[in-house]
């Protein structure tokens, strides 16, 4: 198994969403440092802003459903062209959000690449036929899956796993890879992680701030309600500050409003703005491993 991180630049439109939500996180983090306590409303605003920051790393489409500013889906198409140079090669593409796969579907359709889409809303009676098609149909070369849809799947007839985004909990990342890199896999597995440069994703990657499964239910969408207290809240806030650089942001731009603002989910992106010049993604092979981990 080889793991590779591909660093992808952000467009100005993406950065606007990301940074506005980062300011919300910074204000709530400042309140936490003053009072060592957050209301449930503040905790909900915090988790919403964190999710918005992560979604903006993929595309503005996930936030406004009108525009599609972002390079990740295009970089994926380039990567798949390389993968498909090997006869019969297939790829499994994961994202937490079905909106990411909606963007990808457009790129696949433009290139007439056949695929299946697997998510939590797929009826159980249809799941078997989708998996069988991906396994047996030589024309179907891409398996798109959300985390909710991918639980328990065996997809070892593919040898490439592509993560469009990083889950908060590294155990979820390993579960994704484990759909392909598992007992009985005879081929070398290539794992590619797309990371948005200069964003919360880079902070998550470098600091491993959310290493413990303590926060999985809160930040991976499994918890219906968000409520932390005591030691769990303290550890959570410490990780948030590390991953987002909230403390540094406040030192540079002190918040004048001491109350936490709402998360930004629909302003400005639809306005006319120059598209950033597309830059080549920077790749880094950061880890190789043999055998199952």
What is the predicted function of each stretch?
Residues 1-22, 34-143, 147-151, 222-265, ...:
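Conserved Helicase C-terminal RecA-like lobe
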Residues 1-23, 141, 145-225:
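SF2 helicase/translocase ATPase core recognition
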Residues 24-32:
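Cytochrome P450 catalytic domain signature, combining two hallmark sequence patches
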Residues 28, 53-59, 183-186, 211:
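Conserved, well-folded catalytic cores of nucleic-acid-processing
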